[in-house]
Design a protein with these regions (language model features):
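A short, charge-rich alpha-helical start-of-domain segment used by transcription regulators
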Residues: 1-23, 33
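C-terminal flanking helix
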Residues: 18, 22, 43, 112, ...
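Structural recognition of an alpha-helix C-terminal capping motif at a helix-to-coil junction
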Residues: 37-44, 48, 56-68
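A short pre-motif secondary-structure segment
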Residues: 118-122
Length: 166
């Protein structure tokens, strides 16, 4: 295939998927700059392998690459800092409920990286559990367990916050 066609296909993919990938990276990392860097790294990996992956649906593969990069970055950061990540301060949902978005971000920050990824892919990206298992390269039952455990951790924090806000 000619380079122009390849580049044109990738540009279309980039326009459609880059904003979604950056939002996912932001939710996973809590840091806008790190999210942008990791998104670009994921897109570079996608571009270099574009001839190999473009015939399949590249979107799930891009999410998998991004999640793996976020996990690696998180591990490196934890080795360096030895402290918990801070919740994102600029996450606002569509209705502009800043406080609620910050509460959710703070609650998500107590989850492990993999649990956070499973929750975000399930509820933020509206993916099915089999799709999540494929993206994260984990057995389906493990993804189900990760989701259940994550929700068990989140439920008390978010239910208490809902009661406090009333």
């Amino acid at each position: 295939m000619r380079t122009r066609d390849r580049d044109s296909e990738f540009k279309d993919f980039y326009r459609h998927e880059a904003p979604k990938l950056r939002r996912l990276a932001l939710m996973l990392t809590g840091d806008p700059e790190r999210a942008s860097d990791l998104t670009q790294d994921a897109l570079i990996k996608m571009y270099t392998g574009w001839n190999r992956i473009r015939n399949d649906d590249p979107s799930p593969y891009a999410k998998r690459v991004l999640v793996n990069l976020c996990r690696s970055a998180y591990r490196r950061r934890m080795l360096e800092l030895r402290k918990a990540p801070t919740p994102p301060t600029d996450v606002v949902d569509k209705e502009g409920r800043v406080e609620e978005a910050l509460r959710v971000a703070a609650a998500l920050s107590v989850l492990s990286t993999i649990q956070r990824a499973v929750v975000l892919l399930r509820f933020y990206e509206d993916m099915t559990q089999p799709e999540i298992a494929q993206i994260l390269d984990r057995p389906l039952n493990t993804v189900k367990s990760d989701l259940r455990r994550a929700l068990e951790k989140l439920r008390p924090m978010l239910v208490d916050n809902i009661r406090e806000s009333r």
